[in-house]
């Protein structure tokens, strides 16, 4: 249909043509670029005044541009929605809609989004922002940075979301290209502090060869479907990578992920209580969107074992035939250590900040050294292979679950939350959000 020279020139100009067409349309038709920018400015002022925390693409782009404007990934025509965290999403949705109506805008609507506990704002049929619930204990201590005079979620906290994509091949890889490109640029601007690798830490009560630690490995983990992360997995990876002896860490407790949480909890509790005295456990609520429910086992008041549920993910693993054990892949281990690192920041636990910060930097260093030594890449089969598909468990497709939930509500005569301002301050419905504080359950 086209000469090769014409095909090449068209392909070269497609991005420019799309951009010019979009800008041309918005200069003439509703909602105009002038209106859109005006609404965005009002929303940003609302976020500033209430000291809310911006996350997602808008925050990533703003933080990148703060370091180097030329590296930003949004074009003027992209009109990215602004996502922000709040401990009061319904209140903020109602108040923001009321404020925009008072400013004279039309067709204003706030309503539940696809993702649980997230609400969207539409003005003149354009989607402007996502308002997401964050438990107050996390919101008040969430690490942030400033850009555009707004509180932006810290890059290392947002990085957890990237690793949630990387470790979820079944339901999240449709986001992989966009996520990897953006976060690779973001982390070049805000890398981890390499000096954390030198952190020295010791657990006062640690005994490397203690009886209960060996029992857990041999009688609970070996030949099970539990996937090991944390200290034990870190040391196993370091040994296989032939990392320096100084990289090895004390392992006072073992961490695993379960695909059958309640049944595994019963089995493990019976085994530990049947073989050791003074055993008890504590249950914890999920930690935000990042961790599912968890349980910690204690012996003589010392933490010995922590188990997470799989948080509706198919858990990626690397199997050790020698140890008959499923270990988390490098990327899965990195994500769980990253979550614990940020949880320590939220809880102001300086010891765990030091521990997990050091584990993260050591993991990156040992990986890079190993790959250079053996002339490999992260895509090659081996202990540091990334983006793998072998996993344990049944994943949950959030979009599908949202559609099914909508159907179920409709059948029960229930409806999703929708708010349209009517000239008077709106009534804010009382809604109890799930407990995702990450704190111990009474």
Segments and roles (model prediction):
Residues 246, 301, 322-324, 424-425, ...:
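Intrinsic-disorder/low-complexity loop/linker signature
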């Amino acid at each position: 249909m086209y000469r090769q020279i014409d095909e090449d020139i068209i392909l070269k100009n497609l991005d420019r043509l799309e951009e010019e067409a979009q800008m041309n349309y918005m200069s003439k038709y509703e909602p105009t670029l002038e209106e859109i920018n005006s609404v965005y400015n009002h929303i940003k002022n609302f976020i500033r005044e209430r000291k809310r925390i911006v996350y997602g693409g808008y925050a990533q782009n703003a933080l990148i541009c703060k370091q180097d404007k030329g590296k930003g990934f949004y074009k003027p025509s992209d009109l990215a929605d602004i996502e922000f965290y709040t401990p009061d999403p319904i209140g903020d949705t109602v108040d923001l809609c009321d404020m925009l109506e008072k400013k004279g805008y039309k067709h204003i609507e706030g309503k539940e989004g696809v993702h649980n506990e997230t609400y969207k704002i539409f003005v003149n049929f354009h989607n402007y922002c996502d308002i997401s619930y964050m438990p107050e204990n996390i919101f008040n201590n969430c690490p942030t940075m400033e850009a555009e005079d707004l509180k932006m979620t810290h890059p290392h906290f947002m990085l957890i979301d990237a690793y949630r994509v990387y470790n979820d091949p079944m339901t999240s890889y449709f986001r992989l290209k966009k996520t990897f490109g953006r976060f690779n640029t973001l982390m070049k601007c805000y890398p981890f502090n390499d000096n954390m690798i030198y952190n020295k830490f010791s657990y006062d009560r640690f005994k490397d060869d203690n009886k209960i630690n060996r029992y857990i490995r041999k009688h609970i983990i070996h030949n099970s479907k539990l996937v090991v992360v944390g200290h034990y997995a870190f040391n196993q990876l370091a040994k296989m990578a032939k990392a320096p002896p100084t990289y090895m860490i004390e392992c006072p407790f073992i961490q695993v992920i379960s695909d059958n949480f309640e049944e595994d909890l019963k089995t493990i509790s019976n085994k530990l209580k049947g073989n050791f005295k003074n055993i008890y456990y504590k249950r914890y609520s999920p930690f935000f969107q990042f961790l599912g429910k968890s349980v910690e086992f204690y012996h003589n008041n010392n933490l010995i074992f922590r188990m997470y549920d799989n948080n509706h993910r198919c858990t990626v693993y690397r199997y050790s035939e020698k140890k008959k054990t499923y270990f988390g892949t490098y990327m899965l281990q990195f994500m769980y250590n990253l979550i614990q690192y940020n949880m320590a920041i939220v809880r102001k636990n300086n010891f765990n900040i030091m521990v997990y910060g050091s584990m993260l930097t050591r993991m990156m260093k040992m990986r890079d050294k190993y790959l250079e030594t053996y002339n490999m890449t992260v895509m090659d089969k081996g202990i540091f292979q990334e983006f793998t598909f072998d996993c344990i468990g049944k994943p949950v497709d959030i979009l599908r679950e949202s559609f099914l939930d909508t159907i179920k509500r409709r059948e029960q005569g229930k409806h999703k939350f929708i708010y349209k301002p009517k000239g008077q301050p709106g009534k804010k419905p009382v809604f109890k959000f799930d407990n995702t504080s990450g704190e111990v359950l009474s």
